[in-house]
Curated annotation (Swiss-Prot):
GO terms for molecular function: adenylosuccinate synthase activity; GTP binding; magnesium ion binding. Mg(2+) binds at residues 14, 41. This is Adenylosuccinate synthetase. Homodimer. The active site is at residues 14, 42.
Length: 430
């Protein structure tokens, strides 16, 4: 029986991870976020009520489930407090169930200013970040000048670290980008207020996870973004700033390889991408626009329209291999309802040669031309179907083809946004 399950994106993010995490948290001990920040946007629909979470794990809507934020997550104090208060306004008990690693880095105001200044200066070469300071915060972490949750407990040490960081970042902001610098005293005072607020939630997340493992409790590791946006394995430099793979779950939560029993990869029945970067199967036509409209493909965090395209098996197989994915969850099947024909990319034409492997650089991806297999669509509605047998034959054939081509079994199919709109073929915890 699986005790610890990692849920992660197998495409370019926005695959529907939040719904699946919520679905699987009915009888578990904890959900842990292990990377990213409030650039994530996990949308949950329960009894037709929509909730969008950016930083807090998706298990928060389940009473009694412990929600953990690991050391691999970068935390915006303002965003965290806002999200907690919005959830508390709905009557949920949050702070007694939310535990935050002292080793988690903080996103400071100067990180946001730097992120936005860079994107503006880059013009047409911009990465397409959310402008929320995620990348600069990770840079400071690696550069060993980051301020972490633990530093808030020591006011003198906090002041020293903040002055040093501001000296560095204000120089870059004012001298290189020509924008205003940040005021030390105002930021320091705000951090002291946040220190008092976050102190009761500060906990040894890795220690909690080890204890839960010993107790035989189920734990779900919730990824953000997607494998193809991974800082190492994605379409660099059009990537996020953290490790979105199963390796990121280990280092970002503080557990070992032996602590993971099942890796669930989430993929849409088609493909989407936000921001810049290569996207071989992109549909820049009325078909792509139709998918965008039916799938409501607009960012939960930014509202930006998502680029839409056909399912890319070459990219999906790469995600399966990198993560050692045990089973797939295919989401948004119902978005394809009513389409006459569907296509799946099974290979690339690259430099006059056919390849079933993805290039290792963004320029290589840009030079790929997809090779498609065509499948008949279906006119019947799949929305809300909860049984495999009730799916239209053409929909079942499409899913079986995805499974065979990806070389990985499909364990879950999502047929709508609500928690109940799901076909459970295999429970990852079973």
């Amino acid at each position: 029986m699986g005790q610890s399950v990692v849920v992660l994106g197998a495409q370019w993010g926005d695959e529907g991870k939040g719904k699946i995490v919520d679905l699987l948290t009915e009888e578990i001990g904890a959900v842990v976020r292990f990377q990213g920040g409030h650039n994530a946007g996990h949308t949950l629909v329960i009894n037709a009520k929509k909730t969008v979470l950016h930083l807090i794990p998706s298990g928060i809507l389940r009473n009694g489930v412990l929600c953990l934020i690991g050391n691999g997550v970068v935390i915006s104090p303002a965003a965290l407090r806002k999200e907690i208060e919005e959830l508390e306004d709905t009557g949920l008990e949050i702070r007694s169930r939310l535990k935050i690693s002292p080793a988690a880095p903080l996103i400071m105001e100067y990180h946001i200013a730097l992120d936005q200044a860079r994107e503006k200066a880059a013009g047409g070469r911009a990465i397409g970040t959310t402008g929320r300071g995620i990348g600069p915060a990770y840079e400071d972490k690696v550069g060993r000048r980051g301020i972490r949750v633990a530093d808030l407990h020591y006011p003198d040490q906090l002041a020293e670290k903040l002055r040093a960081a501001l000296d560095y970042h204000n120089f870059v902001l004012t001298r290189y980008f020509g924008v205003d610098g940040m005021d030390f005293q105002r930021i320091y005072d705000e951090m002291l207020v946040f220190a008092e607020y976050v102190e009761p939630m500060k906990s040894d997340v890795a220690g909690i996870l080890h204890d839960l493992r010993k107790q035989g409790k189920r734990v779900l590791f919730e990824g953000a973004q997607g494998t193809l946006l991974d800082i190492d394995h994605g379409t660099y430099p059009y990537v996020t700033s953290s490790s979105t793979t199963v390796g990121g779950a280990l280092s970002g939560a503080g557990v070992g390889v032996q602590d993971i029993d099942y890796v669930l990869g989430i993929a849409k029945a088609y493909a989407t991408r936000v921001g810049g970067g290569p996207f071989p199967t992109e549909l820049d036509d009325k078909i792509g626009q139709g998918i965008r409209d039916r799938g409501v493909e607009y960012g939960a965090s930014t509202g930006r329209p998502r680029r839409c395209g056909w399912m890319d098996i070459v990219a999906l197989k790469r995600a399966v291999a990198i993560n050692g994915i045990t089973g797939l969850c295919i989401t948004k099947l119902d978005v394809l309802d009513g389409m006459d024909k569907l296509k799946i990319c099974i290979a690339y034409e690259y430099h006059d040669k056919r390849s079933e492997y993805a290039p290792l650089d963004a320029q290589g991806w840009e030079e790929c031309t997809p090779v498609y297999l065509e499948f008949p669509g279906w006119n019947e509605s799949t929305h809300g179907i909860t049984s495999w047998e009730k799916l239209p034959p053409a929909a079942r054939a499409y899913l079986c083809a995805l499974e065979e081509l990806a070389g990985c079994p499909i364990g879950i199919v999502s047929t709508g946004p609500d928690r109940e709109h799901t076909i459970m073929l295999h429970d990852p915890f079973a």
